[in-house]
UniProtKB/Swiss-Prot annotation:
To M.leprae ML0007. Its main location: membrane. Residues 132-166 have a biased composition (Low complexity). It comes from Mycobacterium tuberculosis (strain ATCC 25618 / H37Rv). This is Uncharacterized protein Rv0007.
């Protein structure tokens, strides 16, 4: 136990509940009332705390033993409480009281409470655009399935690999040839006429023969007019009449327009039938020949 006048002893109100602040405030009010004039050398109340802290820092109070069950509060702590009371600052929380603190209610957490936790649902539905753009996963090619059967499977795989190599080699050669042909100049293609349709040949030949018939008739009419204007037909008829009169005594015209155009018409009809039939028969014969020895080879090329 210590005497009340010792510097380390606690005052009457310096307990854990800081009741001394009230007593000191009351004493201060009594001392500074209307009946007492403060001394000129006394510092104002808002500067007393700083003066006391500086004095407490210069001198160190001796250790004081306190009874069990009562916490120790040095005068510096009381001065600090007084300074905080005057300045209006909040006291820092230390010791076990700092470890156990009442958690402040979170408005966001209160909004997220309830059935289904909508806050978490909203957070999961919104995409995260802050990070880099995700890349699509690369798919690995499916590994080739091992063939069953031991030596037989090995032989099949070897044959398949050799066949694939030969196909790739052939395709490569074809590409090389094609590129070489392109570099040379115009593209050339050799083809064979292997078959001719007889029905299409018949139709085409019939149309061509009819067209040639009209051409034939126009040509005959033109020649008849030209030769008639030159007097060939009259001279020929007179000469033939003289020969017939001397021989039989009768005269007749050998050349006339009716005889000439009639003969030309008959010749044209015969040509139509013959040309159509010959073309159709020729198509059949050509198809037979192509089956035996091949068709006519035709080379197609670009223009120079």
């Amino acid at each position: 136990m210590t005497a009340p006048n010792e510097p380390g002893a606690l005052s009457k109100g310096d307990g854990p509940n800081a009741d001394g602040l009230v007593d000191r405030g009351g004493a201060h009010r009594a001392a500074t009332g209307p009946g007492r004039i403060p001394d000129a050398g006394d510092p104002p109340p808002w500067q007393r705390a700083a003066t006391r802290q500086s004095q407490a820092g210069h001198r160190q109070p001796p250790p004081v033993s306190h009874p069990e069950g009562r916490p120790t509060n040095p005068p510096a702590a009381a001065d600090a409480r007084l300074n905080r009371f005057i300045s209006g600052a909040s006291a820092p929380v230390t010791g076990p009281a700092a470890a156990v603190r009442t958690p402040q209610p979170d408005p966001d957490a209160s909004l997220g409470c309830g059935d289904g936790s909508p806050a978490e649902a909203y957070a999961s539905e919104l995409p995260d655009l802050s990070g880099p753009t995700p890349r699509a996963p690369q798919r690995n090619p499916a590994p080739a399935r091992p063939a069953e059967g031991g030596a037989g499977s090995r032989g099949d795989s070897a044959a398949g690999s050799s066949g694939g190599r030969s196909i790739t080699a052939e395709s490569r050669d074809a590409r090389v040839q094609l590129s070489a042909r392109r570099s040379r100049g115009p593209v050339r293609a050799s083809m064979q006429i292997r078959r001719i349709d007889p029905w299409s040949t018949l139709k085409v030949s019939l149309l061509l023969s009819v067209a040639l018939f009209f051409v034939w008739m126009i040509t005959v009419a033109f020649l008849y007019l030209v030769l008639g204007g030159m007097g060939v037909w009259a001279k020929l008829n007179s000469n033939v009449g003289d020969l017939l009169n001397n021989a039989s005594g009768s005269s007749a015209e050998l050349v006339s327009s009716g005889t000439i155009f009639g003969g030309a018409f008959l010749i044209g009809l015969v040509n139509i039938v013959l040309m159509t039939a010959l073309a159709t028969i020729g198509a059949f014969v050509y198809n037979l020949i192509t089956d035996l020895i091949g068709g006519i080879e035709v080379t197609l090329a670009d223009r120079d």
